[in-house]
Design a protein with these regions (language model features):
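Conserved nucleotide-sugar donor-binding catalytic segment
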Residues: 140-223
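Conserved donor NDP-sugar-binding/catalytic core segment of glycosyltransferases
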Residues: 101-132
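Short aromatic/hydrophobic "clamp" motif used to bind/position activated sugar donors
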Residues: 89
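A conserved hydrophobic helix/loop-capping motif in glycosyltransferases and polysaccharide synthases
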Residues: 7-19, 23, 30, 40, ...
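Acidic donor-diphosphate engagement hotspot in glycosyltransferases and nucleotidyltransferases
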Residues: 48-49, 77, 98-105, 128-129, ...
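Cell-envelope/extracellular polymer assembly enzymes that use nucleotide-activated donors
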Residues: 5-8, 26, 36, 182
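Glycine-rich, basic loop-to-helix element that forms the pyrophosphate-binding segment
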Residues: 67-84
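Acidic donor-binding segment of Leloir-type glycosyltransferases
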Residues: 24-67
Length: 269
């Protein structure tokens, strides 16, 4: 019987072959060699991702394509978890890059016998700024603050299978945005041990179109859906001051776009 890999990277993918190739190269370059990468193709229509993975000629790459009638990032993430052979599950979007020791650190940080999630610092980069810069704030975990805003950057997360199973349901299919926030909120309520790790584990690619007004409107609607489905009590955004680092408070309260994104539409003084 084959021994399961120490770490499984979970990679939902759709088109963007060059970015996926770079993401997989960052897996292949890991200092820990005992890993697998589970790539779930969410109906790519302008790229042959299966052929791309074949050309890499690495048996640790595990590819599947969603069936007709299936689709969406939540379904792709759930399928990746289901196919993963390791008890340590590491988030990697198809356009992001692992740092070389990420798998080794996740092996050290996660105990498969426990329901645990860790999140690290991330480095923000783009095509125009390939070196990038660290995301400025790493907020220590606060369950009370997570009820109000999502301070966990999804590309920097890793968790045990026990943590994923703790809420009783994985990523919910009704979400095409904020699906990570919904899951992490339910994990926290289910008693998962969540911890910030003050290390850079991943580089998070920022796209030019990622901050458009239309996207922010859609994301705000998804955040409100998370709050309603999870019966989060209405709150004034200023309440984050009781739990958040001063720099995070400034980022959310002094920036009109961020304030609009995270404000609770249900709150009335």
């Amino acid at each position: 019987m084959n021994t399961p890999p120490k770490v499984s990277f979970l990679i939902p993918a759709q088109n963007r072959p060059l970015e996926l190739k770079a993401a997989l190269a960052s897996c292949i370059a890991q200092s820990l060699e005992d890993w697998e990468a589970v790539v779930v193709d969410d109906h790519s229509d302008s790229a042959d991702l299966a052929a791309l993975i074949t050309t890499l000629n690495d048996s640790r790459l595990n590819y599947c394509r969603l069936e007709p009638g299936e689709g969406g990032v939540s379904e792709a993430r759930n399928r990746a978890v289901a196919r993963a052979k390791s008890e340590r599950l590491v988030t990697l979007d198809s356009d992001d890059l692992n740092h070389p020791h990420r798998a080794a650190r996740c092996l050290e940080l996660l105990d498969p016998e426990q329901a645990q999630l860790v999140y690290s610092r991330v480095r923000l980069f783009s095509q125009e700024r390939p070196v990038g810069h660290p995301k400025p704030v790493l907020q220590p975990f606060s369950a009370a603050l997570l009820e109000m805003v999502n301070f966990i950057t999804n590309p920097g997360t890793a968790f045990t299978r026990r943590a994923f199973e703790a809420p009783g349901q994985g990523f919910r299919s009704e979400f095409c945005m904020a699906e990570d926030y919904d899951l992490y909120l339910r994990m926290a309520r289910a008693g998962v041990a969540i911890k910030a790790v003050d290390e850079e584990h991943v580089s998070y690619r920022k796209h030019a179109q990622a901050t458009t007004a239309n996207r922010n409107t859609a994301l705000h609607a998804a955040i409100m859906q998370v709050r309603v489905l999870n019966q989060v009590a209405p709150f004034p955004l200023e309440a984050i001051r009781h739990h958040a680092l001063p720099q995070l408070c400034s980022n959310l309260l002094d920036n009109p776009e961020q304030r609009a994104l995270w404000s609770d539409d249900r709150w009335t003084p």
